[in-house]
Curated annotation (Swiss-Prot):
Job description of the protein: Component of the large ribosomal subunit. The ribosome is a large ribonucleoprotein complex responsible for the synthesis of proteins in the cell.
GO annotations of cellular component type: cytosol; endoplasmic reticulum; ribonucleoprotein complex; ribosome
Pfam family, one: Ribosomal_L34e
Gene name of the encoded protein: rpl34
UniProt family annotation: Belongs to the eukaryotic ribosomal protein eL34 family.
Protein name listed in UniProt: Large ribosomal subunit protein eL34
Keyword Endoplasmic reticulum among record annotations: yes
Length: 117
């Protein structure tokens, strides 16, 4: 005969907080074990990239608070908040903007020297 199962908690509905799995006890009984909700890794701060950040543990917020800092970020500029591709693009953009400023300054200096002659 099949053993009947009952929830161990008061909630009797199939909600996300009431998910269970079957487990066999040493006394050969089958009981419900309550499973924890799965966490999600954070998204990139840029808002453009669709995926989740790599190298960061995907856990619930309460567990994330208890983790050490090495498990919450990667050792890179903007590690733990932006993905590597976005950081690379941001560095390139900043470099090109600085180069453009230098070019403008040089052109202005050349124009000044032309007027002086």
């Amino acid at each position: 005969m099949v053993q009947r199962l009952t929830y161990r908690r008061t909630v009797s509905y199939n909600t996300t907080s009431n998910k269970t799995r079957l487990s066999r006890t040493p006394g050969n009984r089958i009981v419900y074990l309550y499973t924890k909700k799965t966490g999600k890794a954070p998204k990139s701060a840029c808002g453009i990239c669709p995926g989740r950040l790599r190298g960061i543990r995907a856990v619930r917020p309460q567990v994330l608070m208890r983790l050490s800092k090495t498990k919450k970020h990667v050792s890179r500029a903007y590690g733990g908040s932006m993905c590597a591709k976005c950081v690379r693009d941001r560095i390139k953009r900043a470099f090109l903007i600085e180069e453009q400023k230098i070019v403008v300054k040089v052109l202005k200096a050349q124009a000044q020297s032309q007027k002086a002659k």
